[in-house]
């Protein structure tokens, strides 16, 4: 059975910098700093063997390879290496003539629950003179389990577990059991039959282009007659549903629910 309820969420952060590398071939003799390109990365862990790149950047290219160690800071980490994730290597090398390299990490899908809040802090082990105090040498990595999308997971019986409309206009209703079916004429769309009132269906579309932001889209559509909802004739005789422009509506394939504003 599916569940339909309400909510939202979102967070992001970045950091970067520039200066020079001291070699015989570079006229600028400023310090050579090395750091992670981002201070925060969220990884969508799927049921595959995919490795993700965590970029490392230097402020200048040098004429020699630079190899750094990669440490996991246990006191800032609750994900367990070997159980929740694995590193391809505990070192990272910036090749001669280059400014970037990648620490490669893989999440272990079967050992991560959708409700887990797992993350780790990685630290580059480098010479003291290579550390830029402004940005430091750490980065935080968050593991987020992403289940494969299958629209048929949302087909069948569904329970509307809460709605502000219930409290305002359907006083004796706290939950509502409805049926849903896949719309044969629209991609990734389901029809929620008799959503609030018999004869009035609602359609919602599932977006699948961003694994970390599985959003719901809904076009404006009528969901009741004014006579049935308000016991009066008003306007075009219909009450319309509009998707909020202020809050995100989203779904979870892992938990089989949609959260609609």
PLM regions and their residue ranges:
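Ser/Thr/Gly/Pro-rich, low-complexity flexible regions
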Residues: 146-261
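C-terminal motif of bacterial Sec signal peptides marking the signal peptidase cleavage site
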Residues: 17-20
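Hydrophobic helical h-region of N-terminal Sec-dependent signal peptides
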Residues: 9-14
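Positively charged n-region of N-terminal signal peptides that target proteins for export
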Residues: 1-4
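Acidic/polar, low-complexity intrinsically disordered N-terminal segments immediately downstream
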Residues: 22-102, 106-161
């Amino acid at each position: 059975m599916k569940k339909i309820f309400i909510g939202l969420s979102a967070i992001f952060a970045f950091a970067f910098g520039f200066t020079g590398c001291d070699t015989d071939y570079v006229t600028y003799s400023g310090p050579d700093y090395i750091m992670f390109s981002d201070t925060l990365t969220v990884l969508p862990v799927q049921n595959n063997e995919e490795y993700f790149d965590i970029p490392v950047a230097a402020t200048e290219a040098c004429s020699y390879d630079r190899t750094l160690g990669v440490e996991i800071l246990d006191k800032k980490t609750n994900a367990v290496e070997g159980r929740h994730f694995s590193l391809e290597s505990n070192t990272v090398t910036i090749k001669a003539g280059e400014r970037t390299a990648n620490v490669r990490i893989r999440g272990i899908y079967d050992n991560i629950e959708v409700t887990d809040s797992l993350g780790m802090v990685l630290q580059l082990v480098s010479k003291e003179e290579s550390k830029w105090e402004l940005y430091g040498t750490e980065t935080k990595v968050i593991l987020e389990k992403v289940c494969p999308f299958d629209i048929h997971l949302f087909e069948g019986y569904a329970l509307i577990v809460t709605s502000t409309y219930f409290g305002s206009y359907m006083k004796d209703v706290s939950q509502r059991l409805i049926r849903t079916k896949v719309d044969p004429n629209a991609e990734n769309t389901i029809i929620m039959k008799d959503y609030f009132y018999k004869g009035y269906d609602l359609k919602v579309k599932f977006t699948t282009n961003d694994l970390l932001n599985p959003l719901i889209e809904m076009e404006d559509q009528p969901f009741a007659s004014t006579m049935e909802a308000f016991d009066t004739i008003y306007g075009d005789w219909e009450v319309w549903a509009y998707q909020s422009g202020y809050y995100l509506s989203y779904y979870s394939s892992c938990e089989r629910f949609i959260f609609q504003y």
